[in-house]
Amino acid sequence: MRENSHAYFFTRFDCYPYHYDCLERAGFTVKNCLIVEKGTIGGIGDLTGSYANNAEWIIFCQKGRRTFQHTTLLENRKKEGMQYHAGRERSKKYKTRFNACWFGEEYPKATYNSVWQKQHQIYHPTIKNVECLSWLIQISSLQGELVFDGFMGTGSTALAAIQTQRAYLGAEIDKAYFEIAQNRIKEVEKRNVTNYF
């Protein structure tokens, strides 16, 4: 991975300590963990004696140092141009710093629900929402830069990269999922779609 770039790793609460340790040993600086509302509620495990898993854990880390890109993804609730604390910059129209918890209507969901999967005939146990990935990509990279996904599944990261004018490289071990990803990418490129949410 290039110096001064961001990385996002999707995980679970029980795997977080192991992944955190692996990332640090690989030379990443772990900045924090995003908790993003899923588009669905998980339904496996202890269904009567455990809380439903309705959040995706995403480890945010970097190699070197990189700041967030200025985007128009989310309007600031504070009035533009106001100075709320002495010595700090005046507020901007759009947020330049995002919360670590993405819940509610103003943020995209992390995954698609079963209705979306049925409508699109795309079934994957951990399919990610293209809009959510698009936000992460826009916050952390510039147009033309390379986005890599080592576990591309059905290609949501590729679609988000295409939609935000980034180069894309991915790997997938499962041939069936790889073929779905290829078909989704071809469909988007054929239609030259810029909004695939």
Feature locations, PLM:
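Conserved SAM-binding loop
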Residues: 8-9, 170
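Short, well-ordered alpha-helical microsegments
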Residues: 16-19
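Class I S-adenosyl-L-methionine
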Residues: 22-197
